[in-house]
Amino acid sequence: MNLKEFLDIKSEEYNNKAFIENDPIQIPHKFKTKEDIEISAFLTATISWGNRKSIINSSKKMMGLLENDPHQFIINHSDKDLKSLLTFVHRTFNGYDFIQFVKSLKNIYCNHGGLEMVFFNNMKDNSLHNSIHQLKNIFFEIEHLKRTRKHVSDPFKGSAAKRINMFLRWMVRNDNNGVDFGLWKSIPTSYLSIPLDVHTGNVARKLGLLSRKQNDAKALIELDKKLRELDPIDPVKYCLLYTS
């Protein structure tokens, strides 16, 4: 059995609905409309560090503070509504960051056509690295707190942008197994990058897919190249790499 055959088998094992039960992706699965799914997914992915139980609990609190109607809250919130978000905290992401995210998302949905269009309009060189870079620029084009900038990664600054790439996988990829949503038909799955972190990097090195020691933007480019050789159409299907 070669590496591709091994990874394909493992991908089928992991990529099923049973995975949802203990994963943060369960949060956007609670919603029905496109905007609610993508907003809840983006916010959940943003705070996805730490153990999964903590991430899920914090994401549920986020959605509760948005009255379980995230798109409507973001578009129609009042200043009084925003004050209620100050109680939120997950690790270093606090209520002030949450308020900034709501304001920035409102700008994106009201003035830029929504999250999908931000990524679609800035695709370049068969990847979404430039789209992620431009997302950060657009996200903080309005008046903002400097402290909140650290919560939106930028591959052009050397980051592997794990959480945004995880969010993009959820939105773009669709293999009919009911895990990822496949909501964004405008973006090819071939442009996706794997969510790279310490665990992913270590597994990739053991499999001979990655030589670079750091888990950064350069490592992601190297890993992208290898995974696209294995599957040019769906390179991020290899769940084994990032399922611990």
PLM regions and their residue ranges:
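A cross-kingdom feature marking charged/low-complexity
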Residues: 2-30, 83-113, 233-238
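A Lys/Arg-rich helix-loop hairpin that forms a DNA/phosphate-binding surface
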Residues: 67-81, 123, 214-217
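Non-catalytic DNA-binding core/recognition domains of DNA-processing enzymes
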Residues: 49-67, 75-79, 91-106, 200
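Catalytic cores of DNA base-excision repair glycosylases
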Residues: 192, 207-235
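Hydrophobic, aromatic-lined core segments that form the binding pocket/scaffold
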Residues: 88-188, 192-199, 222, 232-236
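Charge-rich, intrinsically disordered N-terminal extensions
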Residues: 1-48, 53-63
